[in-house]
Amino acid sequence: MNILNLKIIMFLLISNIIVVGGAWATSTCPDWPATRIAVEINALEQQLNKWSAAYHQQGHSPVTDDIYDQLQDKLRVWQSCRGLPDKTESQPIPGKGQFLHPVAHTGLKKLKDETALTRWMAGRKNLWVQPKVDGVAVTLVYHGGKLVQLLSRGNGVKGQNWTEKAPFISAIPQYIANAPALLTLQGELFLLMDGHQQAKSGGVNARSTVAGALMRKSPSPLLAQVGVFIWAWPDGPTTMKEKVALLQVMGFPFTAKYSEPVMSHLDVVQWRQFWFQAPLPFVTDGVVVRQEEEPAGRYWQATPGQWSMAWKYPPLQHIAEVKDIHFTLGRTGKGTVVLEVLPIKIDDKWIRRVNIGSVTRWKQWDIAPGDHITLALAGHGIPRLDNVVWRVHQRNTITAPNWDKFHQLSCFQRLPHGCEPQFLSRLIWLSGPGGLDIGGIGGGFWQELIHHELINDLVGWLLLTPEQIASIPGIGNARAEKIYQQFQRAKQQPFSRWLLALGFPQVVSVDAQWQVVLRRSLSEWATMAGIGQMRAKQIKHFLDHPDVQALADFLSTQKVVGFELTE
């Protein structure tokens, strides 16, 4: 048995375990030479910087926030593997904005989970929670109550001038009576929604819609549907109560309506869950927890501050890293490609393997070990490949096996050479629910029989004695006797189940004797309900195949139901 066949067979033994429960570490260091990991870190870092620049300068990114955040986490892991410092939060954002912000935009550091939230809140007081509105960050500048600048965030220090768009955004007051002589506000321009429920509808591309309207040269009618959520008032009132009250008076009502005091992490958890489910006038992607005490505006920098933190909602898209690629040969001779991924939890299921279909489809995806893919759960919790979001710089060439000689009527025996994978798949099907449904008998048991040369064809197990079964390591006499009795009882299974177990290409029940089935002509099969000409040809090819007839002759000697010779 060659190495490739052994790899395929061993994978078949566990390929039915698609999702498993239990904790598993996913943040592991790749088994790469130091030179390669340095190259991969540099490549991923550059790509993240490009996406970040697009996000902050143009209001949209080729990837979602979920994908960006998860790849940023991966970069941190790789950097820690090399002993490099985490620069992801302090990295300046490249930008071409020409207009200086009176106060820099600090951005937000993201909390990973409830434990991180609890740790950050410890020792802090006067904390508030707000929805993290998903929109376009801006600065509003008022002189003597008059709006004089509307600036995009840009790189946090300089942004683009969108002031000419402000009159078309009714949510932005053009003049504020009794405002401070110099008023600088930072907030989010968002698409006004009617009862948007984040848990049900997700992001609906709202931020990109707003960004597109702002970036257009001529005013867009969409600007009338834009709201504003003020989340920072540098050098403003010292208490949040006073701050939100004054903002409401000045014409910014959303901040007061969606700011809540919190005493513990449990309060944050409750508000986060509530806003995730509740109908809201904007799209959100998490919550922001902030403390009242802030440094003076002159100390703010274009890096995340320590007085506010974001705790995002669970990602809608999940990234998995491809660990290996397996090629499996099914019982009908069709090859499939299964990606082995570093374990990832989606909902309540841990995903370790993803079937992506044929070799042709795998080649179209161009997936190699180390690539990062997005996964979702399809029907019955089966993982589905959605996209490839990051390809490693160094791509190892993988050659798929040549399966041209395998088909629906090949490998009813262990030999000739190369048949082991398909033969094993046939045995797994035979004992499974689609065949004879022999409880407790699966791929592992069949592989042991093959390994110890106790079985050479699809029905040879009927000749095994309890002593032969007990000779397999790990199977004692009691279990061997039980298996033997199961095998003997299988002889009394209905004839239709035996046909399906052998691979009979028929989806409807067949209730007859083997000799009767064998004598039916092609035209007789074709006229039967649910069959047709194509399926009839498949049936005749199956029945006339010498290997199948040899199996039927053997089953006749074993007095299996339906195969007995009749006079």
Curated annotation (Swiss-Prot):
Pfam families: DNA_ligase_aden, DNA_ligase_OB. It catalyses: NAD(+) + (deoxyribonucleotide)n-3'-hydroxyl + 5'-phospho-(deoxyribonucleotide)m = (deoxyribonucleotide)n+m + AMP + beta-nicotinamide D-nucleotide. Gene3D superfamilies: 5' to 3' exonuclease, C-terminal subdomain, DNA ligase/mRNA capping enzyme, Helix hairpin bin, Nucleic acid-binding proteins. It comes from the Bacteria. The active site is at residue 132. Its EC number is 6.5.1.2. InterPro entries: DNA_ligase_B (IPR020923), DNAligase_adenylation (IPR013839), DNAligase_N (IPR013840), NA-bd_OB-fold (IPR012340), NAD_dep_DNA_ligaseB (IPR050326), NAD_DNA_ligase_OB (IPR004150), RuvA_2-like (IPR010994). One of its GO terms (biological process) is DNA repair. GO terms for molecular function: DNA ligase (NAD+) activity. Keywords: DNA damage, DNA repair, DNA replication, Ligase, NAD. CDD domains: LIGANc. Belongs to the NAD-dependent DNA ligase family. LigB subfamily. Catalyzes the formation of phosphodiester linkages between 5'-phosphoryl and 3'-hydroxyl groups in double-stranded DNA using NAD as a coenzyme and as the energy source for the reaction. This is DNA ligase B.
